[in-house]
Amino acid sequence: MKTNYEIRYAAHPEDARSYDTKRIRRDFLIEKVFSADEVNMVYSMYDRMVVGGAMPVKEVLKLEAIDPLKAPYFLTRREMGIFNVGGPGVVRAGDAIFQLDYKEALYLGAGDRDVTFESTDAAHPAKFYFNSLAAHRNYPDKKVTKADAVVAEMGTLEGSNHRNINKMLVNQVLPTCQLQMGMTELAPGSVWNTMPAHVHSRRMEAYFYFEVPEEHAVCHFMGEVDETRHVWMKGDQAVLSPEWSIHSAAATHNYTFIWGMGGENLDYGDQDFSLITDLK
């Protein structure tokens, strides 16, 4: 196995206004989340979130501590949320064994020393997408399915934004230090998410898009309300959203995305909305 990581530094919104397409994609887009028998990570300076993916095929993959953590093991001072977006797989945390099927999630609290990822069937490998944030204490590990989620049905087909927001790793479902994660599924015929757009200066966010057909794409919108930019994305890619940035998208097909947040509070509703007509 191999662990790959890179560090992404934070940008001032006034500086980001001058970024060209190449720079925007370099600083915010995470193009390669999954590689066979590898663990890929981005260590972001936005609330020190780590965004990553593990795709075990022929090997069992270990969650290794990367140098920026300066810690004996990855979850020494961190918590983690994991979603399986591939074939059936297993996550082992110490002596605990968690079977994760498609679109099932797992919360791991601080203190888990030995964490591994494996696939049940190498022909249909699991894809474990994860977010990790600093944690001040340990909370119990817990598997969460859509049946456990707080579900909000939003939008309309006429508005091209009919979707179910599955709040899965949130404080209404289980205790966390600062991590919140969930999964939004757009209905056929709907392509817009998070519109009207909002920001939450108390928290950063990361989006991971999947269930995007190969011949289709997602246009992710970011930036300040009056200085928006776009990032064209494919399926199985992620994007970082600073606390000062909107995070929205439209696509050429319906899709699903996983959102993960961390920062000042655990209040999902702490959002500063903007009018659609104010976007520039």
From Swiss-Prot:
It catalyses: 5-dehydro-4-deoxy-D-glucuronate = 3-deoxy-D-glycero-2,5-hexodiulosonate. It comes from the Bacteria. The keyword Acetylation does not apply. Pathway: Glycan metabolism; pectin degradation; 2-dehydro-3-deoxy-D-gluconate from pectin: step 4/5. Binds 1 zinc ion per subunit. It is an enzyme of class 5 (isomerase). One of its GO terms (biological process) is D-glucuronate catabolic process. Gene3D superfamilies: Jelly Rolls, pectin degrading enzyme 5-keto 4- deoxyuronate isomerase, domain 1. Catalyzes the isomerization of 5-dehydro-4-deoxy-D-glucuronate to 3-deoxy-D-glycero-2,5-hexodiulosonate. It comes from Bacteroides fragilis (strain ATCC 25285 / DSM 2151 / CCUG 4856 / JCM 11019 / LMG 10263 / NCTC 9343 / Onslow / VPI 2553 / EN-2). CDD domains: cupin_KduI_C (cd20491), cupin_KduI_N (cd20294). This is 4-deoxy-L-threo-5-hexosulose-uronate ketol-isomerase. The keyword DNA damage does not apply. HAMAP family: KduI. SUPFAM superfamilies: RmlC-like cupins. It holds the Pfam family KduI. Its cofactor is Zn(2+). One of its GO terms (molecular function) is 4-deoxy-L-threo-5-hexosulose-uronate ketol-isomerase activity. Its EC number is 5.3.1.17. Zn(2+) binds at residues 198, 200, 205, 247. Keywords: Isomerase, Metal-binding, Zinc. Belongs to the KduI family.
